[in-house]
Regions:
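An acidic/histidine-cluster motif and surrounding catalytic segment
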Residues: 1-67, 71-241
Length: 241
């Protein structure tokens, strides 16, 4: 498949997780899924459980690049991963861009090949390509054990994790490739949009959503002097497709 080919071209040794799908979700009590701020679609539930297996591996074995099967990587990613071994105090680094603005620190740490790492305070979309360290993995596992979460916007709910963002972005999902001037090598098979719309919010979920919005405003105010809300650039010349 595409991802096996891409990782082979980059010289990566990798482990392919046998991901869950909406058709083979295990039995999980409804009270677990209902603890998020809105109903999660079957595809979102499958993604959470699949990424959870990767988090378990990182927590036990060490830092790793976690990517979904439709993530396209910049050619510099292998060298950037080597450079990250010399950088401390990062627990999660998003490589991806998906069109939305993010709240990023104004200062940055160079990580090679014209790419810098900014502290990431708010994010709404994207979990197709990220680097995760054991401390970050343990925090994500601990948070997810308390109740279901959406993988989109990890920096928004995993506030104890030291999250960073690569800029310019080093990855993009296939369904967004053409938006950034890239030619998609294969057709995207993203499943999230193909699922039926979720049910109406419960009273508890409405309260959680309100609190989440209030927390977002609080973070915007707290980091307003040291951060800026902007879109992440992606440079097509960094990619081989």
């Amino acid at each position: 498949d595409f991802q096996t080919w891409q990782l082979g071209q980059m010289g990566f040794d990798f482990i392919k997780v046998d991901a869950f799908t909406p058709d083979n979700l295990p039995e999980v009590r409804n009270s677990y899924w209902n603890k998020w701020r809105r109903p999660l679609r079957p595809a979102e539930r499958a993604r959470l459980l699949s990424h959870g297996m990767a988090w378990d591996w990182v927590a036990e074995n060490g830092p790793a690049l976690i990517i979904e099967d439709d993530a396209v990587l910049a050619r510099s990613v292998p060298n950037i991963l080597e450079n990250l071994e010399q950088i401390n105090d990062i627990e999660y680094l998003s490589l991806e861009v998906r069109g939305r603005r993010k709240l990023l620190s104004k200062t940055a740490i160079p990580i090679g090949h014209g790419v810098a790492s900014h502290r990431l305070y708010l994010d709404r979309l994207g979990s197709a390509a990220y680097v995760l360290w054991p401390n970050g993995a343990k925090k994500l596992i601990r948070r997810a054990s308390k109740g279901a979460v959406s993988l989109d916007g990890i920096a928004q709910w995993a506030t104890s994790v030291k999250c960073f963002q690569a800029d310019p972005a080093c990855a993009v999902q296939l369904d967004m490739a053409t938006e950034y001037g890239l030619s998609a090598p294969i057709e995207s098979n993203s499943t999230t949009e193909k699922n039926a719309a979720p049910k109406a919010l419960t009273i508890a979920q409405t309260c959680r959503l309100f609190l989440a919005q209030a927390h977002k405003i609080w973070r915007l105010c707290r980091y307003g002097l040291v951060a800026e809300r902007r879109k992440i650039e992606l440079r097509p010349e960094f990619f081989d497709i």
